[in-house]
Amino acid sequence: MPKKIVKGFTTNPSLMRKAGAKDYKSYSKKILKICNNKPVSLEVFADEYKQMKQQALQINTWGKNVYVKVPVANSRGIFMGKIIKELNNLNIKLNITAVYSAKQTEKILKLINKKTRVIISIFAGRAADTGKDPVPEFKKSISIAKKFKNVEILWASVREPYNFLQAKQLGCHIITIPPATIEKIENFGKTFDQLTKETVKAFLVDSKKSKFKI
């Protein structure tokens, strides 16, 4: 099942650093070689408009399956509407990331055309980490984006396998899932009795390895 649900690939500067990438371009090219027939989102890492645009234009040349990933705002909280609109008008496929609210989604939709493909990545897990329920933001974002056949809403920042079902139930077009979580999706469909048996077996294995005595 996990392999069947994988339809594309995305990364960001933080994940690249965690993966040990030393050279942005060569690392990205390796990804594109592996995922040559699937959509791949590659993120700019500049914080200023001019450099961000230069990077976006270059990244866009790396493949027809590339989505250029740009943040909805820079590190100072400045809305990146100008670059979003310009790149969209150049028919560059975009993945607009670090979105948290339907208000941000609405601002994006006011700028883009209705033909060039756009992904809006809403960070569910990080929002939930602060005690905020991301579901209402998804519901509203999905609703207002319905008029745009070229726009897909993405559930980002997954925290648990159940998020996969939540995203599907809400009508999200895409959900980004780390490999470890994809493997856990194999547990879907197991009965509570099966889970109890597996859990107790794990306790037994660990207690034997620990050589516990009372």
Tell me the role of every PLM-derived stretch.
Residues M1, K209-K213:
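Charged, compositionally biased N-terminal leader segments and the immediate start
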